[in-house]
């Protein structure tokens, strides 16, 4: 409580908009910079999404631009209103407390801003910011010594999350929408209890392929011969009667799953590195080759490939041991498959999936009538989460995710780094630690406290 009541007499110019003594001019500068960056983010994002979703011409003519402008307005408002409430709170309270420069100013700004955004996007934004805020609070706790880090904690969290996700995936109506489609793509439809193929139809398809094969035997090339040999090996092997991978035995089923998802992971990481590689194409041509043999490409491939193969292998093993197919197998298989994150450790992925799992379970509780529904829950959670992240950006940026800090710098054209954090060190959070004792040059005519580096007018 003593830390909360501690205050400093500096005004908003001395702490916040140190580049200009005028609150109005600073507001306009932040607004313009945020709007420019917001349009740069959302214009290509919405355009690519429209192309991938195969939108009709009417969407491009009447809906695309309004949606871009609405999302850009939301993001712009979040930045512009923050500096507004920053100045307003200082004028109302007459001084700065430890909570006002960050959390206090960002909370109302975030609440008003999220109301501008479309309702269909609020849930996704809330999940992202809640995940980021949780990670930030965890880092704050570790920095203060109140939380002890657990070795490979992100892997353990992913194991638990994967176990629950795979259980819901196996249950009837357990998952819906994109999450169900994504898991079906990753592990395959053979692991769904309501598998659309019956043994008869599966074998019928195999027979049809064999008939076509006999008709083209003479024209069969060496590649086709090898493929035929591999197919025959895959089909003639141990497969439990409860297993639904009718065209593969259990061993080839796991191997194929690994190869498929390893390729997907490798290609995804390659695609993510393409923009940076082509940016240095003429200055550093060797970077183009590193696009293909980069370590992270193989790490993501190994992560996805081993996740699928371990999950499928464990599921098959449990069917052999118990002589039945049970949804509970997915809990064990999912947990063991989660160990694959050792190849590609990521706190961000673990936290995001855990947040999505909590959201899924919350809505399932609402459907079952066991959990109350809060109409403004997403708005409130977003506001609090964003306020926590802004507070960290002001008071202890060392505990904020680096990618989000870079985003805030882009949104404000670097002005977020110009705050007088040296004056905020009195609150004991090490606000200036990452800024190499940066002290802004201030006009003494507009300051309350004599500045350390006054502007020289001589």
Swiss-Prot record:
Cell membrane is among the record's keywords: no
One Gene Ontology cellular component annotation held by this UniProt entry: mitochondrial membrane
Tree of life domain: Eukaryota
Membrane spanning stretches: 68-88, 96-116, 149-169, 298-318, 331-351, 377-397
One of the Pfam families matching this protein, by short name: TMEM135_C_rich
Biological processes per GO annotation: alpha-linolenic acid metabolic process; fatty acid derivative biosynthetic process; fatty acid derivative transport; long-chain fatty acid biosynthetic process; long-chain fatty acid transport; mitochondrion organization; peroxisome organization; regulation of mitochondrial fission
Disulfide bonds: none
Subcellular location field: Mitochondrion membrane; Peroxisome membrane
Gene Ontology MF terms: lipid transporter activity
Record flagged with keyword Mitochondrion: yes
Entry's family note: Belongs to the TMEM135 family.
PANTHER family attached to this UniProt entry: TRANSMEMBRANE PROTEIN 135, TRANSMEMBRANE PROTEIN 135-RELATED
Protein name as it appears in the record: Transmembrane protein 135
Lineage: Eukaryota, Metazoa, Chordata, Craniata, Vertebrata
């Amino acid at each position: 409580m003593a830390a909360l009541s501690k205050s400093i007499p500096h005004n908003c110019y001395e702490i916040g908009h140190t580049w200009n003594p005028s609150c109005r001019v600073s507001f306009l500068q932040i607004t313009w910079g945020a709007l420019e960056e917001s349009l740069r983010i959302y214009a290509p994002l919405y355009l690519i999404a429209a192309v991938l979703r195969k939108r009709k011409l009417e969407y491009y003519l009447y809906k695309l631009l309004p949606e871009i402008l609405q999302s850009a307005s939301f993001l712009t408002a979040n930045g512009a209103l923050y500096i507004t409430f920053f100045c307003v709170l200082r004028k109302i309270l007459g001084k700065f407390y430890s909570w006002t420069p960050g959390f206090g100013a960002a909370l109302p700004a975030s609440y008003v801003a999220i109301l501008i955004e479309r309702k269909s996007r609020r849930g996704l934004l809330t999940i992202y910011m809640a995940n980021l805020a949780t990670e930030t609070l965890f880092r704050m706790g570790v920095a203060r010594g109140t939380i002890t880090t657990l070795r490979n904690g992100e892997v353990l969290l992913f194991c638990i999350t994967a176990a629950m996700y795979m259980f819901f995936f196996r249950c009837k109506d357990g998952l819906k929408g994109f999450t169900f489609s994504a898991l079906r793509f990753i592990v395959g439809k053979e692991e769904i209890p309501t598998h659309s193929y019956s043994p008869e139809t599966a074998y019928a398809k195999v027979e049809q392929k064999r008939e076509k094969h006999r008709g083209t035997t003479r024209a069969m090339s060496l590649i086709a011969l090898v493929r035929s040999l591999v197919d025959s090996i895959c089909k003639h092997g141990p497969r439990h009667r409860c297993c639904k991978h009718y065209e593969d035995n259990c061993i080839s089923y796991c191997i194929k799953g690994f190869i498929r998802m390893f390729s997907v992971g490798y290609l995804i990481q390659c695609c993510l590195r393409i923009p940076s590689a082509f940016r240095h194409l003429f200055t550093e041509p060797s970077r183009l080759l590193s696009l293909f043999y980069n370590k992270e490409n193989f790490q993501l491939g190994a992560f996805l490939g081993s996740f699928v193969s371990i999950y499928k292998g464990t599921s098959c093993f449990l069917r052999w041991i118990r002589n039945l197919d049970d949804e509970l197998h997915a809990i064990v298989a999912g947990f063991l498959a989660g160990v694959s994150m050792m190849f590609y450790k990521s706190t961000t992925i673990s936290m995001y999936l855990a947040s999505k799992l909590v959201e899924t379970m919350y809505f399932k509780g609402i459907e079952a009538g066991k959990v109350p529904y809060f109409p403004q829950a997403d708005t409130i959670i977003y506001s609090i989460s964003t306020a926590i992240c802004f507070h960290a950006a002001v008071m202890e940026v060392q505990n904020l995710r680096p990618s989000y800090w870079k985003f805030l710098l882009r949104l404000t054209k670097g002005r977020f780094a110009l705050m007088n954090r040296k004056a905020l060190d009195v609150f004991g959070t090490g606000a200036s630690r990452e800024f190499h004792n940066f002290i802004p040059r201030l006009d003494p005519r507009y300051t309350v406290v004599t500045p350390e580096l006054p502007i020289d007018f001589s």
